From Swiss-Prot:
Its main location: mitochondrion. Keywords: Chaperone, Mitochondrion, Transit peptide. The gene is MZM1. One of its GO terms (cellular component) is mitochondrial matrix. Transmembrane segments: none annotated. This is Mitochondrial zinc maintenance protein 1, mitochondrial. It is found in: Mitochondrion matrix.
Amino acid sequence: MSALHAYRHLMRAARVAFDGDARTLTAAYESISRGFRENQNLPANDPTIAPAIAHAEEVASFLRSNVVQGRKDGETYKLRIHKDTERGDNDTIKLGNQNIKIGGEHKCCSA
């Protein structure tokens, strides 16, 4: 993947995540642009380029699937959940106060 593709993916992800919030979207655009501008003069064979592009793609994926904005509407908040928002099944929440084993012999939350 090229830096240009990663840049575009990141800008689109910011637009999806922060749609309707001009101040936050502008700040995200400026931060993304600044980060890419700082590295624009690196030689094509620089070993730091590939990890930086991978990081940009990971951030874009995170923004699309894990950032949800809420707006206060009276005494409640309305969440703007979109088609890319990751929705978990909350299986561990449904178990309640039981001891949950994750991966090994240790109990969850030092229980």
